[in-house]
């Protein structure tokens, strides 16, 4: 991997200037500036290099930052190879915080209809609620029927308030007319976020007709 990327990841992990004292400004730290730098990357040549780095790197903190760099590049240039790699890597990681970060990043990426979403689908059924919610969000930005069907399945089998809220949010983004009957059931909800979320999702779906 190019020295620039190695240096960037090292700077993202650098906490040497993070002194939690009065007047401390986190936006001036080495890691904060490096993270903002990573968010702007658009070089396609970095994709393969970062993929190779992740596959070999044993240090999970470095892998975590490399994932961040990769999904920012994938978002900025709509790189499907990077997106598919990130989804595939869900099955390789075990740290829930890394997985949540990956899933939250994947949520922002365009996923073509033929993209294999199996690992995301499995994560929506995880026993850890943080993982479930991030995975439900990761089903956004796709036209896949499988994604919509999984979210509808979740709604048909849950009473958990937050499962419902996250599912409705994803349907706002990807739902079709077949989601409307299920969403309409939540219009009578006494929970404001559920009721308003369902209203907004139905309206957004109808705009897409």
PLM regions with names:
Residues 1-19, 41-55, 76-91, 111-125, ...:
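Amphipathic alpha-helical scaffolding segments comprising HEAT/armadillo-like alpha-solenoid repeats
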């Amino acid at each position: 991997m190019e020295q620039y990327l190695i240096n960037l990841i090292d700077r993202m992990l650098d906490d040497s200037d993070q002194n939690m004292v009065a007047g401390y400004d986190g936006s001036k730290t080495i890691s904060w500036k490096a993270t903002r730098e990573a968010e702007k990357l658009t070089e396609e040549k970095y994709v393969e290099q970062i993929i190779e780095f992740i596959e070999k790197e044993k240090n999970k903190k470095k892998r975590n930052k490399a994932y961040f760099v990769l999904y920012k590049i994938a978002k900025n240039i709509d790189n499907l190879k990077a997106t598919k790699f990130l989804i595939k890597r869900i099955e390789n990681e075990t740290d829930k915080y890394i997985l949540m970060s990956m899933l939250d990043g994947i949520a922002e990426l365009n996923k073509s209809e033929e993209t294999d979403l199996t690992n995301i689908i499995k994560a929506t059924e995880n026993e850890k609620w943080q993982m479930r919610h991030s995975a439900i969000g990761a089903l956004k930005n796709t036209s896949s029927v499988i994604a919509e069907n999984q979210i509808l399945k979740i709604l048909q089998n849950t009473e958990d308030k937050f499962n419902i809220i996250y599912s409705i949010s994803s349907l706002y983004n990807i739902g079709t007319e077949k989601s409307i009957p299920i969403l309409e059931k939540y219009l009578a909800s006494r929970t404001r976020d559920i009721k308003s979320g369902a209203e907004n999702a139905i309206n957004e779906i109808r705009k897409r007709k």
